[in-house]
Amino acid sequence: MIDTLRPVPFASEMAISKTVAWLNEQLELGNERLLLMDCRPQELYESSHIESAINVAIPGIMLRRLQKGSLPVRALFTRGEDRDRFTRRCGTDTVVLYDESSSDWNENTGGESVLGLLLKKLKDEGCRAFYLEGGFSKFQAEFALHCETNLDGSCSSSSPPLPVLGLGGLRISSDSSSDIESDLDRDPNSATDSDGSPLSNSQPSFPVEILPFLYLGCAKDSTNLDVLEEFGIKYILNVTPNLPNLFENAGEFKYKQIPISDHWSQNLSQFFPEAISFIDEARGKNCGVLVHCLAGISRSVTVTVAYLMQKLNLSMNDAYDIVKMKKSNISPNFNFMGQLLDFERTLGLSSPCDNRVPTQQLYFTTPSNQNVYQVDSLQST
């Protein structure tokens, strides 16, 4: 990880720091020519950070490109407003970077760290860049009044940390919807079965394989580079209006975004054709494709079910049961289910309300069911 990176030449004039007392004075004076960059994991930043600071994260794929000089610092910002703010002000403002506790900075070894790499890159781009002695911990201990703290514990997650490189085990995403998405995505743990009883809240840590090339997941899955690489995922279908496509600038993935909120008023079915075409394109190129929304239980599930219906000539019930067998906590909203029923009629498939006796078993209840094997046959068609 960080220790394996090739050391970046770190000239003595780069080892420039600012004290926490100096920063406090600038904040007290209301210095508008000060740009603070918080280099800690996003969940730590969201929990508490120095006022006016913006969060910067470095996934491994971007870290390598940054080190080679092929990626500008502005590409590291996942939020458009932060990227614009940095671009406007980095050439004129005093830029101060901080991590959790850089108290033993050494100019001879500093270039081996991510903080040193960022300082060098900012210098190369013409910025007046410094690091904060003692980091956030020291500043918070001495000048807590200039720290913004989120007392809402809803951002905490029991999911395992994402293995993304950065300062202090830096991660680039949180499953909190407070800043990213204010629409009506539901907590995966609140999903219910058809009888209204709650489903088990033990959802998979990684995206679920629906077909040998098709994976269903949540927003957090789309930020886990190790998992994307493990499953050969190169295509990412983002079924949200405003969750960022984090690695779009890196050039390693192909994205498609469907701007739909999880709300009864939304017409997701109008995007079925292009979503299905995108998934087929990935399959045709022998690439994995991840379909995700925020929680991974409603919008992305609806698109996945629609794909199975069209490509395997399955009724909505059949396709839904396949997905539910793989991922038990799915819970599309009723409007999306109605759109799937309309899609079923458009495809001329057997309705679940049909009184005709089906020639095959209707529901996929066990892995030994012959219709499940038909799903696997799609890989070779």
UniProtKB/Swiss-Prot annotation:
Biological process according to GO: negative regulation of ERK1 and ERK2 cascade; positive regulation of apoptotic process; regulation of heart growth; response to nitrosative stress; signal transduction
Superkingdom: Eukaryota
Gene Ontology MF: a single term: protein serine/threonine phosphatase activity
Domain Tyrosine-protein phosphatase: 206-349
Sequence ranges of Polar residues compositional bias: 189-203
First-listed, main subcellular location of the protein, grouped into a coarse class: cytoplasm
Region spans: Disordered: 176-203
InterPro entries (alphabetical): Dual-sp_phosphatase_cat-dom, MKP, Prot-tyrosine_phosphatase-like, Rhodanese-like_dom, Rhodanese-like_dom_sf, Tyr_Pase_dom, TYR_PHOSPHATASE_DUAL_dom
Compartments where found: Cytoplasm
PROSITE patterns: RHODANESE_3 (PS50206), TYR_PHOSPHATASE_2 (PS50056), TYR_PHOSPHATASE_DUAL (PS50054)
Gene3D superfamilies: Protein tyrosine phosphatase superfamily (3.90.190.10), Rhodanese-like domain (3.40.250.10)
Catalytic activity: O-phospho-L-tyrosyl-[protein] + H2O = L-tyrosyl-[protein] + phosphate; O-phospho-L-seryl-[protein] + H2O = L-seryl-[protein] + phosphate; O-phospho-L-threonyl-[protein] + H2O = L-threonyl-[protein] + phosphate
Active site: 293 (phosphocysteine intermediate)
GO cellular component, one term: nucleoplasm
Residue ranges of the TM segments: none
Role: Dual specificity protein phosphatase, which mediates dephosphorylation and inactivation of MAP kinases. Has a specificity for the ERK family. Plays an important role in alleviating chronic postoperative pain. Necessary for the normal dephosphorylation of the long-lasting phosphorylated forms of spinal MAPK1/3 and MAP kinase p38 induced by peripheral surgery, which drives the resolution of acute postoperative allodynia. Also important for dephosphorylation of MAPK1/3 in local wound tissue, which further contributes to resolution of acute pain.
PANTHER family per record: DUAL SPECIFICITY PROTEIN PHOSPHATASE, DUAL SPECIFICITY PROTEIN PHOSPHATASE 6
Subunit note: Interacts with MAPK1/ERK2.
Stated name of the protein: Dual specificity protein phosphatase 6
Top-level taxonomy: Eukaryota, Metazoa, Chordata, Craniata, Vertebrata
